[in-house]
Every structure is written in C-alpha cells, then in structure tokens.
C-alpha cells in the first residue's frame, strides 16, 4: 500500500502472523516513497524478541533507503539512543542540525545529552531550540469530515 497508515497497519498485522519478510517489504516500499515515524516503528518492532541493537541494525537498513530524509535520521537516532549508541545517534542527526532542524531532531539531541552525559544544561539548550525549530512534517487527510 502507498498510503502510510495502511502500510504501517499491514506491516504490524503481517509481523504478528510471523510474516516478517512480507511485512518488511511492504514497509520498505512505502518508506522509499514517503518516510514516516509510524513506518519506522512498525519496521523496528516487526520481529518480537529483538534486542535494541537488532532494532538499530534494522532501522539503519530502512534509513539507508532514504538517507537524506529527516525521518531517516530521526528513526536511526531514536533506535541508536535506545541501544545506548550515542555517537551513532549524533551522527544520524548531524546533517539536519544546521539546515533542517525540526522540533523532533532538537528533542532527540536533548535526549542524547541527558542519556550520554547527564548534562541537563545542554539538554535544556536543545529543548529551547526545539521550541523555535520548524514543525515536524505530519500526515494529514485532505478535506473535512
């Protein structure tokens, strides 16, 4: 499915039935057209019992399908934070900090500062930047109900 919510739901259903490869293929195809956090979550958790490092490896593969998209960087960084791979998380976000800073990217940087260095001051600086950063892109339906 080309529709993001449909692809995410299909991926989750297929994964829950043990059809991980089919779920991954659907999510990858949709991600290549339009990266979205719901797709990243469905992809990361497609295999039950994966470690945080396994999920990081999976998300890295997904992110490399659209390496210059902020959603790829955010998904990769989030998985890296969960795996406590803070240098990887910083690397994933670096291309977006100066030119495409979004609220989520700044919040992820704040999480890194707190988790890696327990630096509340730097985390607050990132949260302040998040307040004035560009809004994150969101999926919306056209029309009215």
Question: Which residue stretches match the model-derived regions?
Answer:
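TPR/TPR-like (Sel1-like) alpha-helical repeat modules
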Residues: 20-38, 97-103, 114-138
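"A position-specific structural signal for the A-helix of alpha-solenoid helical repeats
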Residues: 8-9, 42, 75, 104-112
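Start-of-helix register in tetratricopeptide repeats
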Residues: 5, 38, 71, 104-105
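Solenoidal tandem-repeat scaffolds enriched in leucines and small polar residues
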Residues: 1-4, 9
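Intrinsically disordered, acidic/Ser/Pro-rich low-complexity regions proximal to membranes
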Residues: 1, 14-17
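Alpha-helical adaptor scaffolds
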Residues: 25-98
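Alpha-helical linker/edge segments of TPR/alpha-solenoid repeat scaffolds
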Residues: 46-62, 86, 115-127, 133-140, ...
């Amino acid at each position: 499915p080309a529709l993001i919510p449909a692809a995410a739901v299909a991926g989750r259903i297929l994964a829950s039935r043990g059809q991980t490869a089919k779920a991954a293929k659907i999510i990858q195809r949709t991600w290549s057209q339009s990266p979205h956090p719901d797709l990243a979550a469905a992809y990361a958790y497609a295999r039950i019992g994966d470690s945080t490092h396994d999920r990081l490896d999976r998300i890295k593969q997904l992110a490399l399908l659209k390496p210059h998209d902020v959603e790829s960087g955010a998904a990769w960084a989030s998985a890296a934070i969960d795996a406590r791979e803070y240098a990887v998380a910083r690397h994933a976000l670096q291309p977006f900090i100066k030119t495409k800073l979004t609220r989520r990217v700044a919040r992820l940087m704040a999480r890194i500062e707190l988790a890696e260095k327990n630096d509340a001051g730097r985390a607050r600086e990132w949260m302040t930047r998040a307040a004035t950063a560009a809004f994150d892109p969101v999926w919306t339906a056209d029309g009215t109900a």
